[in-house]
Amino acid sequence: MAISKKSSLFLPIFTFITMFLMVVNKVSSSTHETNALHFMFNQFSKDQKDLILQGDATTGTDGNLELTRVSSNGSPQGSSVGRALFYAPVHIWESSAVVASFDATFTFLIKSPDSHPADGIAFFISNIDSSIPSGSTGRLLGLFPDANVIRNSTTIDFNAAYNADTIVAVELDTYPNTDIGDPNYPHIGIDIKSVRSKKTAKWNMQNGKVGTAHIIYNSVGKRLSAVVSYPNGDSATVSYDVDLDNVLPEWVRVGLSASTGLYKETNTILSWSFTSKLKSNEIPDIATVV
């Protein structure tokens, strides 16, 4: 069937208008295949059906995701924990020993009236039925159980304390808890099955400023890398080599988590995107994107 000249002009114009409206209205999108997953949230609606919200996490306030509790006037509250997980599982490895590469980015706003903001935000990967551990407010970032609730009979099992069998995380830690191995300054860190980070880097957290976290796993080099940056050029970078198939189950979920304790801060997520693919070496190492 022939297409008129008027119709041929209309199609590209219509396509442009549609794409423009998607950008203006910040429409989220996702694609899901057996061995690949992509999603992008440019804003969060009040009824965000493709997220699993846990604890104090809420969506819809100014189009943002609030991971921890805030008052009606937006003030942060203490002793809060919340998480958001994408609903679809991720195929992170398969029996042929092929492991997925992935790329995650989120923008965030941490704001605190306290002289010591606490406690931070983490991007994490865990088993598909993951839930918030008991006692994981404050320094444990909603990811790891507290020593006081891990007990063997009446004795605390310190080997199990602060550990989780199926957690890989990149933490943006705003408050140094040196008693659990933190360096004595705000930092970013890579956590493998424990809140005691395998690798850390000093982070100049900017109170009330929007920052960006970019996380990459290159399955060819088995390197997990992260960069946290601000518009003024300040950044922190950390990397650690890990075989994800030795740490995580074959199918996982990805999420964002945050907590407050005695000190407090808002833990606001403005956008979040994620892409993973098995048998892919197309996702670059962090050094090529910074």
UniProtKB/Swiss-Prot annotation:
Name of this protein: Concanavalin-A
Residues annotated to bind a carbohydrate: D119, R139, L262, Y263
GO annotation (BP), single: regulation of defense response to virus
Coiled-coil ranges per UniProt: none
Feature type site, description Cleavage: N148, V149, N163, A164, N281, E282
Family per record: Belongs to the leguminous lectin family.
Residues annotated as glycosylated: N152
Propeptide segments, given as residue ranges: 149-163, 282-290
Keywords linked to the UniProt accession: Antiviral protein, Calcium, Glycoprotein, Hemagglutinin, Lectin, Manganese, Mannose-binding, Metal-binding, Mitogen, Signal
Cross-referenced PROSITE patterns: LECTIN_LEGUME_ALPHA, LECTIN_LEGUME_BETA
Additional facts recorded: Binds one manganese (or another transition metal) ion and one calcium ion. The metal ions are essential for the saccharide-binding and cell-agglutinating activities.
PTM annotation: The mature chain consists of residues 164-281 followed by 30-148. To form a mature chain the precursor undergoes further post-translational modification after removal of the signal sequence; cleavage after Asn at positions Asn-148, Asn-163, and Asn-281 is followed by transposition and ligation (By formation of a new peptide bond) of residues 164-281 and 30-148.
Residues spanning the membrane: none
Binding-site list for Mn(2+): E171, D173, D182, H187
Subunit structure: Homotetramer.
Pfam families listed in its UniProt record: Lectin_legB (PF00139)
Keyword Lyase: no
Superkingdom as given in the UniProt entry: Eukaryota
Role: Glucose/D-mannose/rhamnose specific lectin. Has hemagglutinating activity towards rabbit erythrocytes. Has mitogenic activity towards murine splenocytes that is inhibited by glucose. Inhibits HIV-1 reverse transcriptase with an IC(50) of 35 uM. Has a potent antiproliferative activity against L1210 leukemia cells in vitro that is not inhibited by glucose. Inhibits translation in cell-free rabbit reticulocyte system with an IC(50) of 2.08 uM. Lacks anti-fungal activity against M.arachidicola, B.cenera and F.oxysporum.
Molecular-function GO terms, alphabetical: D-mannose binding; metal ion binding; monosaccharide binding
Entries under InterPro entries matching the protein: ConA-like_dom_sf (IPR013320), L-lectin (IPR016363), Lectin_LegA_CS (IPR000985), Lectin_legB_Mn/Ca_BS (IPR019825), Legume_lectin_dom (IPR001220), Leguminous_Lectin (IPR050258)
Extent of the signal sequence: 1-29
Protease among keywords: no
